[in-house]
């Protein structure tokens, strides 16, 4: 296996009941959950599948309400997925199951007790997940969703490195119990107190190293990982901890071990902004923590310039003297002020923030890349509103759709954004359109959808029984959408459009997204009625709409029989 493959799983809302609790160490609370909804069950006329959790690091999402009744924040269950509702009271936390026994109707979750010994295990200092677990009693209910997917791990490995802090222990325990790959393991675990040390079921060729590290210690875990003597052959590196503590481990995996991206899975389970806030973080993955460095437009442009000019790479490798960067001095001064760089005895070094910008593409894309270019188009929004053209077109001379054809980076970004459609495949693959013999595919998400239904993508040519468009409209202006749909009439009598038609409750600030969308294509994000209006303008009739989850709708169009 040369790459990691994501296996989508049906998203199902489940109500479980606490069967027992146990403090397995002073800093780890175990909760055993049961109930008929761990197996196949029925709700509201829907037959819903049993819980599956095939990967040792898969996670389920726990649902809480910060105020009021949890029933008011629960997502809506649809046939093959869920629809999150927007709610200020909605709180979710992700946890890795230690064990799942569907036949025995038992799910086991472990919760790190960050506040152990403080007397605040169930108080305001505890995160919402920790507080719930410490207060849980048999009979209490818990609502969960997921896993949304599982990542197949590579099998062409000779040894595995597992590293993390206390939040990684559930995944490590499950790996050792199930052994998805039968190879020697080197395990490095950081704990905040000796009381968190545990006995794991190690194999004869496994080795484990325990290190003491405070919550704000970003060096001890990485140093212990760097001390691991590499074994012969190809490694697989898995790590989970506080996001910034993982930065040197990312470098170690790629530079020292030579681990390919397909053989590296390093996830920030939480982000520490202040030592006292650790308890509130719980154990949820946060691959792209928000960086509090943009205090003005000037700092945004400074960070963008540092990324685009390669200055951060120069500092990371050479640690140049500050006085040697005469021409760059104003830029360096701003980067020092916003905590991207630090001056150590006259030499420049990256801070944790600078490291994050350099090694985490999800963080960097806020300042450089297509997403940042879309934000930059807002500079021309006022002029664009006067002309009736999108701000992107005013700024670049091309529409966004034209840019996607002309520039590989824009096209690749759209394909990357559509990659998330893989999580909706359990619903998408049930659409009646896929019973047709000859199907064409188009749009940035065409590859994901076609692969999910066992088809291939080819340039549209000739006629088809049906054409499926995956995110084919989102990057187009209204005028371009109508023209595209009119052209589609020459290829088929039936089209299915898979598009986002409402905000996803967990998808970030919808108001900011709507403004950037306006600047990019000249209109607000389209809802179902707007899609229908544009289809009608192109002489199509909407015959069916199906929610496939996450604010996404599959809209079936037929050629208007009144139009030749």
Task: Provide a role label for each language-model segment.
Residues 1-296, 300-317, 323-325, 336-345, ...:
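Extended, composition-driven regions rather than compact fold-specific motifs
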Residues 434-448:
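Conserved class I S-adenosyl-L-methionine
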Residues 334-436:
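Conserved Class I S-adenosyl-L-methionine-dependent methyltransferase catalytic core
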Residues 500-538:
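C-terminal alpha-helical "lid/dimerization" subdomain adjacent to the S-adenosyl-L-methionine
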Residues 151, 455-464:
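Short acidic low-complexity segments
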Residues 475-491:
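A short, conserved alpha-helix within the catalytic core of class I
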Residues 472:
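Hydrophobic adenine-recognition pocket in adenosine-nucleotide-binding enzymes
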Residues 468-469:
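A conserved beta-strand element that flanks and buttresses the S-adenosyl-L-methionine
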């Amino acid at each position: 296996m040369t790459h990691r493959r994501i296996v989508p799983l049906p998203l199902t809302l489940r109500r479980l009941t606490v069967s027992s609790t146990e403090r397995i160490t002073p800093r780890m609370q175990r909760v055993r959950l049961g109930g008929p909804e761990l197996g196949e069950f029925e709700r509201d006329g829907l037959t819903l599948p049993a819980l599956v959790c095939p990967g040792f690091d898969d996670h389920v999402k726990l649902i809480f309400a910060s105020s009021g009744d949890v029933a008011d924040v629960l997502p809506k269950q649809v046939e093959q997925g869920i629809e999150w509702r927007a709610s200020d009271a909605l709180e979710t936390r992700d946890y890795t199951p230690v064990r799942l026994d569907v036949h025995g109707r038992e799910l086991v979750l472990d919760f790190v007790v960050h506040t152990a010994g403080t007397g605040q295990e169930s108080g305001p200092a505890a995160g919402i997940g920790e507080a719930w677990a410490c207060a849980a009693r048999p009979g209490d209910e818990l609502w969960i969703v997921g896993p949304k997917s599982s990542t197949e791990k590579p099998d062409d490995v000779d040894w595995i490195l597992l590293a993390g802090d206390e939040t990684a222990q559930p995944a490590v325990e499950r790996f050792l119990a199930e052994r998805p790959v039968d190879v020697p393991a080197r395990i490095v675990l950081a704990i905040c107190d000796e009381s968190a040390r545990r006995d794991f079921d190690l194999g004869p060729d496994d080795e484990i190293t325990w290190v003491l590290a405070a919550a704000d210690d970003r060096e001890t875990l990485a140093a212990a990982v760097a001390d691991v003597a590499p074994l012969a052959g190809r490694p697989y590196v898995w790590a989970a901890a506080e996001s910034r503590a993982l930065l040197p481990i990312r470098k170690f995996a790629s530079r020292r071990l030579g681990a390919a991206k397909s053989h590296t899975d390093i996830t920030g389970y939480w982000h520490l902004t202040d030592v006292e806030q650790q308890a509130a973080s719980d154990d949820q993955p946060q691959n792209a923590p928000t960086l509090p460095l943009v205090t003005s437009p000037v700092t945004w442009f400074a960070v963008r310039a540092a990324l685009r000019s390669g200055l951060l790479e120069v500092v990371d490798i050479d640690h140049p003297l500050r006085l040697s960067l005469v021409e760059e001095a104003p830029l360096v001064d701003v980067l020092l002020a916003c905590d991207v760089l630090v001056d150590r005895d006259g030499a420049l070094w990256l801070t944790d923030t600078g490291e994050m910008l350099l090694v985490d593409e999800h963080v960097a894309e806020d300042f450089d890349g297509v997403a940042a270019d879309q934000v930059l188009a807002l500079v021309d929004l006022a002029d664009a509103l006067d002309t009736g053209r999108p701000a992107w077109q005013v700024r670049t001379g091309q529409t966004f759709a034209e840019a996607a054809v002309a520039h590989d980076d824009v096209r690749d970004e759209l394909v990357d954004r559509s990659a998330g459609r893989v999580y909706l495949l359990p619903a998408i693959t049930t659409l009646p359109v896929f019973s047709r013999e000859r199907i064409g595919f188009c749009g940035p998400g065409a590859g994901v959808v076609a692969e999910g239904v066992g088809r291939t993508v080819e340039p549209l040519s000739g006629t088809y029984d049906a054409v499926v468009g995956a995110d084919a409209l989102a990057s187009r202006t209204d005028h371009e959408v109508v023209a595209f749909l009119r052209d589609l009439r020459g290829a088929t009598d039936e089209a299915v459009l898979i598009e986002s038609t409402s905000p996803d409750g967990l998808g970030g600030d919808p108001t900011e997204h709507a403004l950037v969308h306006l600047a990019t294509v000249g209109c607000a994000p389209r809802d179902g009625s707007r899609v229908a209006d544009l289809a009608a303008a192109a002489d199509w009739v909407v015959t069916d709409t199906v929610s496939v989850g996450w604010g996404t709708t599959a809209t079936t169009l037929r050629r208007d029989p009144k139009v030749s």
